[in-house]
């Protein structure tokens, strides 16, 4: 984590996942998908009928990276959605939302073949005590 002249902390985190491992998890334990992902995330991933687990894997990678940056929250409390321009955005619920107060999260997702990658950066104001 580093600070800038404007009085903010910046931190980054990335996570890589093997798509086949996520597919095996989903096929062996289908209820795990419902515990990890929101209904909106499940609908979005299942729209991609030929490669749904690439989409699940990249979202799971993002959830792991966000949780590591926040230090709190269940995976289901971290939702990966889309902004108005189609860009990935993080929506926080429950304890993750409390941990994320005042923090600006930016997200980049990528998947190619059997690898899913997520890069997350967070900016939060410095706390000044007198």
Segments from the language model and where they lie:
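Core catalytic alpha/beta fold that binds nucleotide/phospho-ligands
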Residues: 1-130
